[in-house]
Swiss-Prot record:
Catalyzes the ATP-dependent phosphorylation of L-homoserine to L-homoserine phosphate. GO terms for biological process: threonine biosynthetic process. GO terms for cellular component: cytoplasm. PANTHER family: HOMOSERINE KINASE, HOMOSERINE/4-DIPHOSPHOCYTIDYL-2-C-METHYL-D-ERYTHRITOL KINASE. ATP binds at residues 86-96. InterPro entries: GHMP_kinase_C_dom (IPR013750), GHMP_kinase_C_sf (IPR036554), GHMP_kinase_N_dom (IPR006204), GHMP_knse_ATP-bd_CS (IPR006203), Homoserine_kinase (IPR000870), Ribosomal_Su5_D2-typ_SF (IPR020568), Ribsml_uS5_D2-typ_fold_subgr (IPR014721). It comes from Thermosynechococcus vestitus (strain NIES-2133 / IAM M-273 / BP-1). Belongs to the GHMP kinase family. Homoserine kinase subfamily. Transmembrane segments: none annotated. PROSITE patterns: GHMP_KINASES_ATP. This is Homoserine kinase. Pathway: Amino-acid biosynthesis; L-threonine biosynthesis; L-threonine from L-aspartate: step 4/5. It catalyses: L-homoserine + ATP = O-phospho-L-homoserine + ADP + H(+). Coiled coil: none annotated.
Amino acid sequence: MITVVTVPATTANLGPGFDCLGAALTLTNRFTFSLSDRPHVSVRGPEAAAVSSGPNNLAYRAYSRFYEYLGREAPPVYLEIDLRVPLARGLGSSATAIIGGLVGANRLAGFPLSHTEVLELAIEMEGHPDNVVPALLGGCRLAVQEDAGGWHWLEIPWDQDVVPILAIPDFELATETAREVLPPHCAYGDAIFNISHLGALLRGLETGQREWLQLALADRLHQPYRQSLIKGYPDLHRAALEAGAHGLVISGAGPTLLALGDPVTASAIATALKETWAKFDVQAQVEILAIQHQGTTVCDR
């Protein structure tokens, strides 16, 4: 039996939703599992050379972690990875690997774990929920943790006229580097600012109202510290707004930038971002995408 798992890229944080809000995008990685007499990993795609093809491969580690959790020996598999989500760009590439490995293992084991159990394992591996939850479930998702540690996730309605435009530069930014610039504590005023703006953002995404989205994308917990890691950020922000964007934020830990626009302004926003980054000698791939509502899919062939 051959099992194919397709996992969407994700954009996380969306401004004020630091480490709790993310959305699945119409850009995917594919993981193909077939039982074998020995473990083997094969990776293809534009950045395949940067991905381990041995036991340290993240998708294979997730596959092995699943069986470790069950207390069973992992059956050897031939794992083929079709890599389309850019690495270390703030698009949830690690989340696709973790979800791909766990879901593939769950299928081969006969689906012993629920979505909730798979996500708890994924959050344990990833360290935060904002990418893995929408990667598995699709749509825009808010992750909420209980005092006791358990997780819940809500689907956030996303108006079809709110268009995500992703500007993906030709340089990487490791998540660890982006986290190192964050202060260890935040002021009450900044926390309150983000709470109120997150509420406004959820309303803006649901209704598509420009005035809410323009207000809501501001953040004080992570973006002010990370903007210095992204060449030309002030100019890019200004160019996006002048082209008609509701706002511009850092996608995940960066360096990809996410602009929210509408069907009329999306093309102009994409052009403005590409041309502005070129002024800083940065070649950017700009994609006008949509929210992917299916989440991870599994099929056998």
